[in-house]
């Protein structure tokens, strides 16, 4: 069994080897992906992939705590990051209160917060109170309404400069790593080179310090929509449907159960 990652080992990976981060929402999948992942992200994406909602905004703190504990049961040797859901860190006091609640009631090793310079003060406040924080810059799913949709960042020089400012502000605030999402590859590479902490990409090219994907996307289980940045490593939906049809057919023809399945 591989040694569990720590804040220190995550930071030291910068420039040595890319970090592998995968999302999980339950014990079953957490157990399956643990051997391959350096870190498991319990993302608020569960509101879409698991709960079937249209976006992440209605995910609650209670949901995140519940699923973080489920993941921890299945992946006892993994570094687990819990997403802080929309509306739980709008100011210093609420952010600290809600972060403490997650730490006290779940097995999270760290929390992830969306935002750049605008969230640096809150991140600093959390870090100074013993909360490990992973940042998240670029395309921010929790801000899709105010942004007018999910828009790729880094297309203009102004956006490039702001992304670098965001990354440096998060690093200075005390974050141990950050996710960069939906950013032009060349700009994401510049952002990663501008800071000393790992920058983990999703839809941000290969020249960053690691990658993260949603497990149901990469396994081909989510059929409704596949983002451009997702590679399907398995046609999971087709395989599952085929297996379920075989089961249904065998039940209807009484081919199942056979003697070996009977007491």
Swiss-Prot record:
Residues the entry annotates as binding Mg(2+): 44, 83, 114
One annotated GO molecular function: magnesium ion binding
Subcellular location(s) of the protein: Cytoplasm
A GO-annotated cellular component: cytoplasm
Domain of life per record: Bacteria
Active site as annotated: 181
Coiled coil, from the record: none
Residues at which 3-methyl-2-oxobutanoate binds: 44-45, 83, 112
UniProt keywords, alphabetically: Cytoplasm, Magnesium, Metal-binding, Pantothenate biosynthesis, Transferase
Assembly and binders: Homodecamer; pentamer of dimers.
NCBIfam families: panB, PRK00311.1
Membership in a protein family: Belongs to the PanB family.
Protein name, entry field: 3-methyl-2-oxobutanoate hydroxymethyltransferase
């Amino acid at each position: 069994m591989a040694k569990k990652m720590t804040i220190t080992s995550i930071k030291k990976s910068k420039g040595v080897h890319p970090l592998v981060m995968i999302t999980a929402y339950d014990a079953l999948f957490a157990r399956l992906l643990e051997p391959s992942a350096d870190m498991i992200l319990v993302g608020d994406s569960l509101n879409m992939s698991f709960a079937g909602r249209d976006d992440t905004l209605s995910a609650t703190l209670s949901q995140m705590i519940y699923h973080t504990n489920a993941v921890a049961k299945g992946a006892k040797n993994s570094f687990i990051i819990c997403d802080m859901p929309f509306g739980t860190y709008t100011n210093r006091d609420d952010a600290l209160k809600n972060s403490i609640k997650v730490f006290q009631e779940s097995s999270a090793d760290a929390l992830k917060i969306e935002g750049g310079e605008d969230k640096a003060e809150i991140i600093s406040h959390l870090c100074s109170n013993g909360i490990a924080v992973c940042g998240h810059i670029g395309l921010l799913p929790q801000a899709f309404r105010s942004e007018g949709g999910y828009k790729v960042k880094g297309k203009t020089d102004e956006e490039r400069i702001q992304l670098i400012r965001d990354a440096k502000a998060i690093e200075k605030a005390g974050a141990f790593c950050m996710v960069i999402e939906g950013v032009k590859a060349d700009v994401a590479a510049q952002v990663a080179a501008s800071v000393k902490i790992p920058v983990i990409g999703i839809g941000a090219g290969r020249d960053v310090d690691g990658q993260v994907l949603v497990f149901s996307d990469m396994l081909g289980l989510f059929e409704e929509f596949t983002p451009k940045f997702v590679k399907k490593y398995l046609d999971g939906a087709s395989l599952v449907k085929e297996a379920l049809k075989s089961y249904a057919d065998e039940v209807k023809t009484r081919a199942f159960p056979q003697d070996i399945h009977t007491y």
